[in-house]
Amino acid sequence: MDTYETINLNDYTQIGEGGNGKTYVTSADSDEILKVNNARLSKWEAVKHEYDVSKAVASLGIPVPAIYRIVQVGDAYATISQRIKGKKSLSRICHDEPERTEEMARLLCRKGKELFATECNTQFFPSRRDQALLAIEQTSFVSCKNRERLRSFVESIAEDSHCLHGDFQPGNIIQAGTDNYWIDLDRFGHGDPMFDIGHLFLICHIYAPMKRVQDIFHMTLEQFHRFWDTFAKEYTGQDEHAVFDALAGRFAALDVILRTIFQKPNFVEKLFFGFYVRKLMKQYYS
C-alpha cells in the first residue's frame, strides 16, 4: 500500500454533510474539497475503489468532478477532489425553490437518458444483472420462495452494456450555473436502465414517508411524489404510467436485495430490508 499525505482537520472547515460522510475546505475560495466518508466507507479499499471508479467514469466522457488524490485523516482514508463552487444538488434546489420540483425531475430524466445511452467499460465496471443474481444467492432476509421468484425475474432481464449510476436520485446530480455533474459513483455499473429507475422509485414511494429520508433529501413527501410523477411522464412520454410504475416496483425489490452486495447490512438493517422486500414482493410480484 502506498504512503499518503496526512491531513489535519484542524486546518479545515466543514461545509457539508450527507448520508455517506462530510466535506471540508481549507478556505472559502479553495479550489479543492476534502471528502471524509463515514467509518464503513473510509477504509483504504473503499476509498481506493471510489478513486478508481471516478477516474474510470470520467474517461467515458461523463461529467464528474475531477478527483485528485487519496489522503489520510487519522486512521481513515479520504479524497481530495475538484470543488464545484456555487453548486447545488437537484434535491437542494427542490427544497430551496419548491416550484422547480418538476423542472428538476425532467432534468434528472434527461441526464439519466444520456447516461443510459453511454457505452460502459464492461471490463472495469460490474454487470448489475450479475450482481443481482449474486445478491439473491447471498441474502439472508428473503424467503426461499421469494428468492426463486426474484431469480426468475432477473434471469428474464437482458444483459446491457450501457452505464448505470447505482444511486440514481436527485441528490446525486449537482448543478453549477449551466453545468451538471454526477457525484457518489461507487456503485457505478452497467445494465438495464430500470435498475437505476427502480432505485429512484424506491426512494420516492417506499422510503419517502420516513422523516430521516426527507431530511437527507431536503424534500417533503408531497415533493417526492410530484418528482416521481413528472419523471415517469417525461421518461415514458405518457401521462398514464401505471405499467411503468409496476415495473419500477419490481426493480425496486431488486434494489433492496442489492444492499447485500453494496453495504453488507448488519442485523438491524437486514430486518429493515427484509420488511420492505416482502412489502414490494406482495405488491409487485403477485
Range-by-range predicted roles:
Residues 242, 254-286:
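ATP/Mg2+ or Mg2+-diphosphate-binding catalytic cores
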Residues 6-14:
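Conserved N-terminal boundary motif of the eukaryotic protein kinase catalytic domain
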Residues 173-197:
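Catalytic activation segment of kinase domains across protein kinase-like and atypical kinase folds
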Residues 38-40, 187, 259-260:
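Short beta-strand-loop-alpha-helix junction that forms the active-site gateway
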Residues 2-5, 117-166, 170-171, 176, ...:
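An alpha-helical support segment within catalytic cores of ATP-dependent transferases
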Residues 13-14, 19-123, 158:
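ATP-binding pocket architecture of kinase catalytic cores
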Residues 197-237, 252-268:
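Active-site activation/catalytic loop segments of kinase-like enzymes and analogous catalytic loops
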Residues 86, 90-95, 102-104, 110-132, ...:
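Inter-domain helical "communication" segments and dimerization helices
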